Design a protein with these regions (language model features):
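Short linear motifs embedded in intrinsically disordered, proline/glycine-rich low-complexity segments
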Residues: 1-360
């Protein structure tokens, strides 16, 4: 038996994920290799089709040896002689978040590895699979939902073929300058890579602000796992930090942290939201930042953004918290945590002091 051969591949536009199709003597498989060549690498797989006759039973022994097995006959929808696929007719459509993909053949969806692949024994969907199997679930059962996501993703990525950043940048700067006046500094934080991102500094009434622009261009992964049908309301974010002028010496270290954090959701295949925390080590006496959303907390100021691609942009203010507060916050829900805040309308403005009183 010859070694399997990679016959087609592509890379996610925003995540460190390699998508490829592998052909063996027995079958074709679609793979997503997440963070390849790293300690955190994960491989997601989905059967595409068999080559030659289909077996009566699943080859468990081959699976145990790491060999991609053929699908048993009772779960196969393609012809008995199997598939013979031309690599030049493949196309990969990345989902909007960049962490999931559909494989097309002659413009028809034949295999899909969505963001929820890997949970509860689910690998992905395949056009030629029937029912629920260990190798793939039947695509026909989910076709309406999946095909809609694929069409939306095609339209989404086509938006970036034009001079999109000039328009998006102008929208962000207009929102920020309406909030704090003429901006003072503009930092590119994308490292020259897609998507473009910036951090904009401004000030008003004795407070210095640093707010990102462009993080919201790409929706964050896996927001639907928490927000369900409302996930599109919360999957686009910008990050903000506000500090009194007396403490503005912190800005360089905080802005550097924000620059790295701006890529965090796509690097780690996760999302940031109201009530989440991230550890820090650059503000003495404080061990983490708590994210709060003005959309979820009445009275807290925010720039007023226009919708982007028909979706809301959510600013997340970063609120530094002490070690004891961090331990409490991670064990309780956000509403209970915020009940200890002593000045909710200025909770986002850091002055070197804790914003909470009386946390047990």
């Amino acid at each position: 038996m010859s070694e399997p051969e990679v016959i087609f591949e592509d890379w996610s536009p925003v995540c460190n994920i390699n998508a490829f199709v592998e052909k063996s003597d027995a079958c074709y498989y679609f793979y997503l290799w997440v963070n390849p060549q790293s300690d955190s690498a994960v491989v997601k797989s989905c059967w595409i089709g068999n080559i030659g006759n289909s077996p009566e039973e699943l080859d468990i022994e081959a699976m145990g040896e790491g060999i991609a097995p053929r699908m048993p006959k009772q779960y196969v929808l393609h012809d008995e002689e199997g598939l013979d696929l031309d690599p030049d007719r493949f196309e990969i459509v990345w989902f909007e978040e960049g962490n999931a993909a559909a494989l097309l053949y002659d413009d028809e969806i034949i295999s899909v590895i969505p963001g929820w692949s890997g949970y509860n024994g689910f690998n992905g969907y395949a056009r030629y699979a029937k029912g629920i199997t260990p190798l793939a679930w039947g695509l026909l059962d989910a076709y309406d939902t999946i095909s809609k996501r694929v069409e939306e993703s095609k339209a989404f990525w086509s938006e970036f073929e034009e001079d999109f950043w000039t328009k998006a940048q102008s929208m962000h700067l207009a929102a920020l300058e309406s909030f704090f006046g003429k901006y003072e500094k503009y930092y590119a934080i994308d490292g020259g890579k897609f998507p473009p991102k910036a951090l904009v500094r401004g000030s008003k009434k004795g407070v210095v602000y640093g707010i990102t622009a462009g993080v919201s261009l790409i929706p964050m992964p896996n927001v639907d796992t928490v927000y369900g049908d409302e996930f599109k309301e919360y999957r686009r974010i910008e990050l903000g930090f506000a500090v009194t002028e007396e403490k503005e010496s912190l800005c360089n270290s905080v802005f550097s942290f924000m620059s790295g954090l701006a890529a965090f959701p796509w690097r780690e295949d996760t999302f940031l939201a109201h009530g989440h925390t991230v550890p820090i080590n650059f503000i003495e006496g404080f061990e983490a930042v708590l994210f709060i959303s003005p959309r979820r907390l009445s009275g807290v100021e925010t720039p007023e953004y226009k919708d982007y691609m028909g979706e809301k942009i959510n600013l997340l203010w970063m609120v530094p918290v002490t070690g004891a507060e961090y331990q409490f916050i991670t064990k309780h829900d956000i509403d209970e945590n915020l009940s200890y805040a002593y000045d909710i309308e200025r909770i986002h403005i850091f002055d070197g002091k804790s914003k909470f009183i009386g946390m047990p």
